[in-house]
A protein has these predicted regions:
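Structural microenvironment flanking redox-active thiols in thiol-disulfide oxidoreductases
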Residues: 56-101
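Short active-site neighborhood of thiol/selenol oxidoreductases, capturing the structured segment around
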Residues: 41-61
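Bacterial N-terminal signal peptides
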Residues: 7-17
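Short, small/polar residue-rich loop motifs at catalytic or cofactor-binding pockets
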Residues: 22-23, 126-128
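A short beta-strand-turn-helix
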Residues: 26-46
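Positively charged n-region of N-terminal signal peptides that target proteins for export
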Residues: 1-7
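Short, internal strand/loop/helix patches
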Residues: 79-81, 96-127
Length: 162
């Protein structure tokens, strides 16, 4: 193996591993059609992001949101990320946004119509709900999969930076 090839075979996997844990640059509209950028969301505060891509995701987000609002420190930003790439073309986007407004009126829910940000942030395909914790710089600290339970809530809270 050449002197150049060996360092590259080591560097590329490391670069991908680091990229998977850091928030990617994005601009997505929320359910109110307000644009949010990666810089807006990760603006010097810890972020708990609830994400999913199934029909029941808004219900699961609502349950997590309620529990997080009770137990997470007020300095933590709680946001949703809805992967909507699988929505059939004939379903009006406005009906999905209205449903999100109704279920999560006081929470930013980013609408990822192409599923690219969802994938780049490392959320699993086919997930009803996953909850990730990011530090103030957008570094992912961990992901908890599944509906809210006391055990999963404890896992999420343990991931929050001090």
């Amino acid at each position: 193996m050449s002197r150049i090839a060996l360092p590259l075979t080591i560097a590329f996997p490391l670069a991908f591993a680091v990229a998977a844990n850091a928030a990617t640059d994005f601009t997505l509209d929320d359910q109110y059609e307000k644009p949010h950028t990666q810089a807006d969301i990760f603006a010097g505060k810890a972020v708990v992001m609830m994400a999913g891509m199934e029909r029941k995701t808004p219900d699961a987000m609502q349950a997590w949101n309620k529990a997080l609002r009770r137990k997470a420190p007020p300095t933590v930003l709680v946001v949703g990320l809805s992967n909507l790439e699988g929505v059939p073309f004939f379903v009006p986007k406005s009906s999905i946004k209205k449903a999100l407004v109704k279920q999560l009126p006081n929470t930013i829910v980013l609408c990822d119509w192409k599923g690219k940000t969802y994938a780049k942030l490392g959320f699993p395909k086919g997930s009803t709900i996953s909850v990730a914790v990011f530090d103030a710089h957008g570094e992912r600290l961990g992901v908890v999969n599944g509906p809210v339970t006391d055990e999963r809530m404890a896992q999420v809270l343990a991931l929050l930076p001090p």
